């Protein structure tokens, strides 16, 4: 590994071009007010490279989901998920989280824990490629997941709007010795 102490080390002009999360970096660099929780959250997201700048059209689309509905509008759902997944910084589990907080009676978070506890011997490992076909596969997976999750809720007699939380905790308890992907050693 090279360091600044190596004889052949030198800086190049390109080293001065810091393009990491350019819009957020600029906003943070120019912030002159007092720290507050919103600023702390932005700094944390900047550092872990998880800041998602969702455009106003996508936010407007998310807001078209009826907060009080108990029935899924599949066409709108597909459109919303596609827009979210095409946004830099938004991956599959995060997109489902946005939907869950918009209407938990229709949507629940899809993640490794809940997925593995309802699908024996299957691993939740979505591709992060933003191609049209890959996003379509993820949307189909999510729609099927919601259907299957409803069946599990009926079987276990739990309310759907709390299913992701209940099953997350159940997985932590019953699979506490099983590692998750990207957390320590992979399965």
Regions found by a protein language model. Name each.
Residues 1-43, 108-187:
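C-terminal accessory module of base-excision DNA glycosylases/AP lyases that mediates lesion recognition
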Residues 30-83:
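Alpha-helical ds-nucleic-acid-binding substructure associated with the helix-hairpin-helix region
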Residues 77-80, 94, 145:
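N-terminal alpha-helical segment
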Residues 87:
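Acidic-histidine catalytic/liganding microenvironments
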Residues 95-100:
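Short hydrophobic alpha-helical segments that form membrane-spanning helices or hydrophobic packing faces
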Residues 101-107:
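Catalytic Zn2+-binding segment of zinc metalloproteases
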């Amino acid at each position: 590994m090279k360091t600044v102490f190596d004889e052949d080390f030198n800086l190049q002009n390109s080293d001065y071009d810091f393009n990491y999360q350019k819009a957020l970096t600029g906003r943070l660099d120019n912030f002159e007010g007092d720290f507050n929780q919103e600023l702390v959250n932005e700094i944390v997201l900047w550092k872990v490279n998880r800041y998602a700048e969702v455009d106003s059209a996508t936010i407007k689309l998310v807001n078209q989901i009826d907060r009080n509905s108990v029935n899924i509008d599949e066409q709108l759902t597909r459109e919303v998920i596609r827009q979210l997944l095409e946004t830099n910084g938004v991956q599959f589990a995060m997109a489902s989280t946005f939907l869950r907080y918009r209407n938990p009676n229709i949507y629940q978070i899809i993640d490794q824990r809940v997925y593995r506890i309802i699908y024996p011997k299957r691993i939740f490992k979505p591709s992060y490629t933003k191609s049209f076909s890959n996003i379509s596969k993820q949307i189909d997976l999510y729609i099927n997941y919601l259907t299957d999750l409803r069946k599990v809720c009926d079987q276990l007699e739990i309310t759907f709007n709390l299913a992701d939380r209940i099953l997350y905790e159940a997985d932590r308890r019953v699979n506490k010795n099983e590692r998750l992907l990207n957390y320590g050693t992979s399965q």
